[in-house]
Each structure stands twice: as C-alpha cells, then as structure tokens.
Amino acid sequence: IVAAHDIPYAATASIAYIEDFIAKVKRASEVDGPSYIHVIAPCPTGWGIPVDETINAAKKMVDCGLWYLAEYYDGEFHLNRDPKEFTDVSEYLRCQTRFAHLTDEDIEHIVEGRDAKWAKIRREWI
C-alpha cells in the first residue's frame, strides 16, 4: 500500500535479521522525503511463545517464507533475500499457541498461499 503511493523508500524488515534491518534504517534516513519500514517483531504474549523465543520465531517466519525482506525505491521492488528452499511452515506455526487450532489442511492452505505469493514476487521483482 505504501509503495502504491510512490514514496521514495519503503521496506520490510525483521528483528531476526538485524544487519538487514540496520541497513534499511540507514538507507531510509538518507532518503529525501518520507520513508516507511514495516518490521516484524513477534509479541510473546499475543503469539503464545516464550519471551526467549522471540528472535527465533521472527527468524522462522522469514525462513519459512511467510515474511519476506524487500525494499521499494526508485519506483521498483528489490528482494533482499530469496531463499532457494523454505523451512517447514508447520514448525513455525505449531510453536505458537495462537495457531493451536490449525489443522494440517489449514496449514497446507497457508503453504499454497505462500507459494503463490512467492511465485508472483519472483516473477515481478526479479
């Protein structure tokens, strides 16, 4: 949505990939005009994970492909991380109490959605 307004800089980031996050904050601070960074930072209480698993949960989300690391600048999207293979989505989901109700069929549907999203990203951004 932010990119649709053609702002000078937008990005997605994760607390699990801190070097990437820092680089994006630096780039955003150097842009003339508005910038936006959407950061995934798990909430232990809301997600139903132990506090000491926060970074690991954020890493699993990126590694299983449910969150991507990208930037938008000069009117184009740029993928910062394009994994050849994804880790198991069910491992990411099942470690959180908020997803305890999901069936195997539900998770398969999520995987199908992830695969469709990544096919579009790779087709249009790379």
Please state what every model-predicted region is.
Residues 17, 40-45:
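Glycine-rich beta-alpha junction loops
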Residues 28-36, 57-60:
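Short, structured secondary-structure boundary patches
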Residues 10-13, 36-40:
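Short, conserved beta-strand edge motifs with alternating hydrophobic and charged residues
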Residues 43-126:
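Flexible, low-complexity linker and terminal segments
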Residues 1-31:
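Conserved thiamine diphosphate
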